[in-house]
Amino acid sequence: MNSLSFLNHEFEAFPSPELALTDPNGLLAIGGDLRPERLLTAYYHGIFPWFNADDPILWWSPDPRAIFIPGQVNISTSLRKYLKKQPWHFTINHAFTDVMAGCAQPRRKQAGTWITHEIQMAYRELHHNGHAHSVEVWHGERLIGGLYGLAIGQVFCGESMFHRETNASKAAMLLLQQHLINMDFKLIDAQVMNPHLESLGAKPVKRANFIQLLTQFRDNTANPAAWIPSEVTLEL
């Protein structure tokens, strides 16, 4: 029978993801902190933090796991036509803090957000250290969509996305896919399946299979040019 682990502020090791609870699905550990070293260790082993503002830090590794293989993100004919008509432009790593703030805004019918101030501060530090990255969608000078996540070797671990204009988050996802293909990334970790991710082409895989893929690609050296702040054209 699997049991929950409790982390302190000194102990960096995580239990094996195989020990995660089945109810709630994937809950592995409680406690610890959000220092860069602990966060990087978590993602390296297929674990991520996810908790509400009033909760302790909760660490997860769900089964199944939602993933994209770069090149398999869906784009319908209607979406392609729609995006071609938009005067939007795209950047990489130009506005990480603003993207996180956009993602942190509560969705409709949601009272709060899991992207707390504590989470934002922790991931800004990861960004400053070259581990966390953002994709931005602009309409003129206005940020209308984007996403952020972490790069672990040739794996991109997506965290959240947002939009302020219709389909802007989908455009950010397509831009991310294009960029990751160009930079020879092999896997996108989307964490937990939901209808929006499924509509974009995410696939559920068993946790053991995800860990196998992660292990295969996490130690590979990424293209050093991958996350230089840049303007990028979305090719449709």
UniProtKB/Swiss-Prot annotation:
It is found in: Cytoplasm. Signal peptide: none annotated. SUPFAM superfamilies: Acyl-CoA N-acyltransferases (Nat) (SSF55729). The keyword Zinc does not apply. The keyword Cytoplasm applies. Gene3D superfamilies: Leucyl/phenylalanyl-tRNA-protein transferase, C-terminal domain, Leucyl/phenylalanyl-tRNA-protein transferase, N-terminal domain. Belongs to the L/F-transferase family. Functions in the N-end rule pathway of protein degradation where it conjugates Leu, Phe and, less efficiently, Met from aminoacyl-tRNAs to the N-termini of proteins containing an N-terminal arginine or lysine. This is Leucyl/phenylalanyl-tRNA--protein transferase. It comes from Shewanella sp. (strain MR-7). The gene is aat.
